[in-house]
Every structure is written in structure tokens, then in C-alpha cells.
Design a protein with these regions (language model features):
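Short amphipathic alpha-helical boundary/capping segments
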Residues: 10-19
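Helix-turn-helix DNA-binding motif, specifically the short coil turn and the N-cap/start of the second
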Residues: 47-48
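Short amphipathic alpha helix immediately N-terminal
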Residues: 21-32
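Hydrophobic positions on the alpha-helical face of helix-turn-helix-like DNA-binding modules
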Residues: 26, 39-41, 51
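Residues within the DNA-recognition helix of helix-turn-helix
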Residues: 54-57
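Intrinsically disordered, low-complexity basic tails/linkers immediately adjacent to helix-turn-helix/homeobox/MYB/SANT
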Residues: 69-96
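C-terminal flanking helix
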Residues: 59-66
Length: 119
């Protein structure tokens, strides 16, 4: 369940602007605020089934966008590769004892990778 919630949260972050305002709001309430379908429905004066339909439609749309684009999958893969490259750069820095051109290059690489991880 937690993996599904994390996956949906990432889809919302990446593609939420492609949804209607109501779909974004309902997904946020359901996945991020952890409100029940009944609570969401009551808030807007609709049925529980109505809230369920809006959320399900929005989730399907986000999943379909990801299936077509693979953006989230590629982003996750890139983050893993950046962590691996950072570990290698830090090991090179350690092995160079912080001295000379190799240490300088390794330190520059660590700084570049830190910047990439933050973006």
C-alpha cells in the first residue's frame, strides 16, 4: 500500500497540472491529507461513489500519462545513478587523500552531483 501511495504522490507531483482542479484537489485530499472517500464527499456535498469516481478517473489518467511517457520511471532511475556516481566521486576523493589534481577533480564532481540531486 505504501509503495502505491508513494507512486501516486509522485505521479501527482509530476503530472498534477494536467488534471482538472477538482481532480487535483480530490487526489490531494485522498493521498496526501489521508481523508476518506466519505469525508471528501461530505466536504463537497456529493456521494461517496461520486468522490470515488473522480479519484479513480484521475488516477487512471495519471497512470496512463506515465505509461506513455515513462517520465517518473526515468527520473527514479536517474536519481539512483546520481547517488551511485556521488558515492564513486566521494570514494575517489577519499583515495586521493584530499591532495592534488585528482582530489580537486573529485571535489568538483561531488559538487556538480550535489547540484543535480537537488534539481
Amino acid at each position: 500500500m505504501e509503495d502505491e501511495t508513494l507512486q501516486m504522490t509522485m505521479l501527482i507531483d509530476f503530472f498534477g497540472d494536467l488534471l482538472t482542479e477538482k481532480q487535483r484537489e480530490y487526489l490531494d485530499l485522498y493521498h496526501n491529507e489521508d481523508l476518506s472517500l466519505s469525508e471528501i464527499a461530505e466536504k463537497d456535498g456529493i456521494t461517496r461513489q461520486g468522490a470515488h469516481d473522480i479519484i479513480t478517473r484521475a488516477e487512471r489518467k495519471l497512470a496512463e500519462i506515465e505509461k506513455k511517457t515513462g517520465v517518473v520511471k526515468r527520473w527514479l532511475s536517474t536519481q539512483t545513478e546520481l547517488r551511485q556516481a556521488d558515492a564513486i566521486a566521494r570514494e575517489l576523493l577519499r583515495l586521493s587523500n584530499g591532495k592534488g589534481k585528482p582530489a580537486e577533480l573529485a571535489q568538483n564532481l561531488v559538487m556538480i552531483l550535489e547540484g543535480l540531486k537537488d534539481s
